Amino acid sequence: MRLRHKPYAMDRINEYSHIVIGNPEESAGNWKEIFGNEQPIHIEVGTGRGRFMYDMAKANPHINYIGIEKFTSVVVDALDKLIEEEVPNLKLINKDAEDLTVFFAKGEIDRVYLNFSDPWPKNRHTKRRLTYKTFLRNYEEVLVDGGEIHFKTDNQGLFEYSIMSMAEYGMLLTYLSLDLHNSDYEGNIMTEYEEKFSSKGHRIYRVEAKYRTEPMQ
């Protein structure tokens, strides 16, 4: 994806620092205070232009959401949605998710969403995939005991790699669909990419995986 430089982006992000949290490492352990309530917190790693998080937050006001996106020129589009109509249970972070464990305290997050992540198809780039074991360990660190990952992609190779990576890590796969849009799954909220790919006839793959609270026998 080619990103268009937006010279105004940082100024806008700084102006709305109550939405895009500028120094998230200073907020670790205090996110419920930032939201002003005790509601559960769900995060999306690689939130892109924010449609999924925006729609999820609107549909579920009893849950707090945080979208994490490293590209400034992309996250500013997500911010623009919230400037037009602020959603109090949604915040954004403009940082790389590799630093996830410094943004949140242990057990502070209830669920992680990974939607249409970069597949990094070359073997030498395996460690960059957001379902590589190092990332799975980081998610586990910030999730509550028994926390979940919900993952969607149109890339069959990444999907197969991801379910294998999760299983090898010891996670429990609680839901799996090889063709989400032709399944009986209810309540699916689409991302921008999902709408684009599915309209072209691409299959959408989905898996929900849960961290085990007890070691496998």
From Swiss-Prot:
Secretion signal span: none
Protein name: tRNA (guanine-N(7)-)-methyltransferase
Molecular function via GO: tRNA (guanine(46)-N7)-methyltransferase activity
Organism of derivation: Bacillus mycoides (strain KBAB4) (Bacillus weihenstephanensis)
The protein's role, per its UniProt record: Catalyzes the formation of N(7)-methylguanine at position 46 (m7G46) in tRNA.
Enzyme Commission designation: 2.1.1.33
Record NCBIfam families: PRK00121.2-2, tRNA (guanosine(46)-N7)-methyltransferase TrmB
Active-site residues annotated for this sequence: 118
Gene of this entry: trmB
Listed Gene3D superfamilies: Vaccinia Virus protein VP39
UniProt record similarity statement: Belongs to the class I-like SAM-binding methyltransferase superfamily. TrmB family.
PROSITE patterns per the UniProt record, alphabetical: SAM_MT_TRMB (PS51625)
